[in-house]
């Protein structure tokens, strides 16, 4: 591939970071990845083609990692996420997120020119910032300069309210890195919907009844304004909930198509896919509208 960027993708998942390189039309070749989840591995290979897998990051021998120009290491977020257990990333703590520290030996041995990391913004929160800085100091001792910033996907053409911290680290002398400017975009859920989603994503009539009952209790006028609005928004448009207020959770929320999705998380069977309303909503006629989950492709 000539001067293609050689990439190693640790904590690869389904390969979203190498996918970004494809979208940006950056000539590259993934020379190895590291992933242990069998379904993620299957998805990765289907999307990107068969790729050498280094396996468990905690068992990788640094000298056996192929030389690379870019190493990505977006480690598990569960121990730093506000919805997780907050056990942190302290070296030697044994938490999922502390797997980060197994990257240290690999980076020291291979010294890629570029490093890329993405994680939840709470990594910069008061409970975790100290250990994050310790990691930054390690990279600086190897000769890297670190640039990090919290970015929101909705500012870059993705209809999802998703704030994440990104860190780019560059080895040796270089022109100072600048993160992309915010884009003036108005992409909303409506823009990414499939034309003919499978019937299995549509909710049962009982859910529609509960939705209407709760809307009437909360006041229909505001909901109707949101449903009928055609103005695009860079915010989530929360129309109502299928569940009573005391059970109010993301699982029951119905969102407007003219806004952005809430932050997507791993569903783990929790019925937490964002749900939208379709059709000409008439609260007196159940057949005037449908409620459905976003499909995996839409997510």
Where are these regions (language model features)?
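SAM cofactor-binding core of SAM-dependent methyltransferases
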Residues: 8-58
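Short glycine-/small-residue-rich Rossmann-like dinucleotide-binding loops
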Residues: 76
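Nucleotide donor/acceptor-binding cores
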Residues: 5
């Amino acid at each position: 591939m000539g001067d293609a960027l050689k990439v190693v993708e640790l904590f690869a998942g389904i390969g979203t970071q190498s996918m970004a390189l494809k979208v940006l039309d950056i000539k590259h070749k993934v020379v190895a990845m590291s992933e242990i989840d069998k379904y993620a591995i299957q998805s990765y290979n289907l999307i990107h083609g068969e790729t050498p897998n280094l396996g468990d990051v905690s068992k990788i021998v640094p000298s056996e990692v192929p030389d690379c120009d870019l190493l990505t290491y977006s480690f598990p977020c569960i121990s730093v996420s506000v919805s997780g257990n907050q056990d942190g990333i302290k070296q030697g703590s044994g938490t999922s997120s502390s797997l980060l520290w197994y990257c240290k030996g690999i980076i020291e041995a291979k010294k890629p020119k570029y490093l890329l990391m993405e994680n939840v913004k709470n990594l910069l929160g008061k409970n975790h910032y100290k250990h994050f800085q310790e990691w930054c100091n390690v990279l600086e001792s190897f000769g890297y300069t670190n640039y990090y910033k919290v970015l929101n996907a909705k500012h870059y053409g993705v209809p999802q309210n998703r704030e994440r911290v990104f860190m780019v680290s560059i080895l040796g002398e270089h022109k100072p890195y600048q993160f992309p400017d915010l884009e003036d975009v108005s992409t909303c859920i409506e823009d990414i919907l499939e034309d003919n989603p499978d019937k299995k994503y549509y909710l049962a009539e009982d859910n529609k009844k509960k939705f209407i009952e709760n809307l009437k209790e909360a006041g229909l006028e505001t909901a109707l304004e949101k449903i009928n609005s055609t103005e695009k928004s860079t915010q989530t448009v929360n129309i109502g909930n299928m569940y009573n207020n005391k059970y109010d959770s993301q699982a029951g929320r119905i969102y407007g198509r003219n806004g952005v999705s809430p932050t997507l998380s791993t569903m783990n069977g929790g019925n937490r896919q964002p749900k939208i309303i379709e059709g000409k909503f008439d609260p007196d006629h159940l057949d005037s509208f449908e409620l459905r989950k976003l499909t995996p492709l839409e997510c």
